[in-house]
Structures are given as structure tokens and as C-alpha cells.
Regions:
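Glycine/serine-rich anion-binding loops at beta->alpha junctions
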Residues: 14-20, 41-42, 65, 69, ...
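Interfacial segments of multi-pass membrane proteins
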Residues: 47-50, 73-77, 88, 92, ...
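Short helix-capping/hinge motifs at transmembrane helix termini and TM-loop junctions
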Residues: 16, 30, 73-77, 100
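Short, flexible coil/turn micro-motifs enriched in small/turn-prone residues
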Residues: 12, 25, 32-37, 61, ...
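N-terminal signal-anchor transmembrane alpha helix
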Residues: 2-28
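Nucleotide and nucleotide-moiety/phosphate-recognizing core
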Residues: 5, 9-10, 54-60, 65-97, ...
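Cytosolic, membrane-interface loops and tails of multi-pass inner-membrane proteins
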Residues: 23-54, 103
Length: 127
């Protein structure tokens, strides 16, 4: 019973990772992003196919979902919980069950999750 909250958190992190803004924004524009451009459901393909505004929205949502999943897990659990949520949200982005296991590459989600773990290091690395 003591591991149940951790299992629930990891499952929720995976489901958060399943949110594919590239696919959803593509649907909003009436385009299947997985069949256009490079076929990848990621920010770069959205930039190529749909333009800058759609790509910025995709990027921000991908970063935010990685950040929020790890931030919540870190506040509720120890470092193990944060690391498991980190892995789950990135895996959920790359292999989303809601979109037939065809997602993006996970770069923006990874950066958001890493930012939640240690944001000063992420800003230093960006310089």
C-alpha cells in the first residue's frame, strides 16, 4: 500500500506525457502532422508545416508538461518519485498510448522535466 501513491503519480506523469500538442494543434489547423513534413509529432515539424505561432505553442506546452509532472512529483515524493515521473513523462511523450505510440522525440519535454529538477543548472547550461 505504501507504493500505491507513487504508482499513481508515475501513471499520471505518463498520461501527462501523452498530451501531444503537435497533434492537437495540427488537428486544429486541419492537418495530420504525422503525415505532413517529416512525419514527426514535434515542434520542428510543426514549425515547418504550420509556422512559428503554432511551433511556439507546441514548444511551450511540451516544456510545461515535463516541468509540471516532475515538479508535482518532487513536491509530493522524494527524489526517486521525481526521477520516475521524469522518465514517465518523457516516455509518455515519445510513446503516447493515446496516439498509437507515435509521438515526438521528447527533447522539449526532457528540458522541462530537467528544469523542474534543478532550474538554476538549466539556465547555466543554456548560457
Amino acid at each position: 500500500m505504501k507504493y500505491l501513491p507513487l504508482v499513481i503519480m508515475v501513471t499520471l506523469a505518463y498520461l501527462i506525457g501523452n498530451i501531444s500538442p503537435a497533434t492537437l494543434i495540427g488537428r486544429f489547423y486541419g492537418i495530420d502532422i504525422k503525415k505532413a513534413g517529416s512525419g514527426n509529432a514535434g515542434t520542428t515539424n510543426v514549425l515547418r508545416v504550420l509556422g512559428t505561432k503554432a511551433a511556439i505553442c507546441t514548444l511551450l506546452i511540451d516544456v510545461f508538461k515535463g516541468f509540471i509532472a516532475v515538479y508535482i512529483a518532487q513536491g509530493r515524493f522524494n527524489n526517486l518519485g521525481a526521477m520516475l515521473a521524469f522518465a514517465a513523462v518523457v516516455i509518455g511523450h515519445i510513446y503516447p498510448a493515446l496516439f498509437k505510440f507515435k509521438g515526438g522525440k521528447g527533447v522539449a519535454t526532457f528540458l522541462g522535466a530537467a528544469m523542474a529538477l534543478n532550474w538554476p543548472s538549466m539556465f547555466a547550461a543554456a548560457l
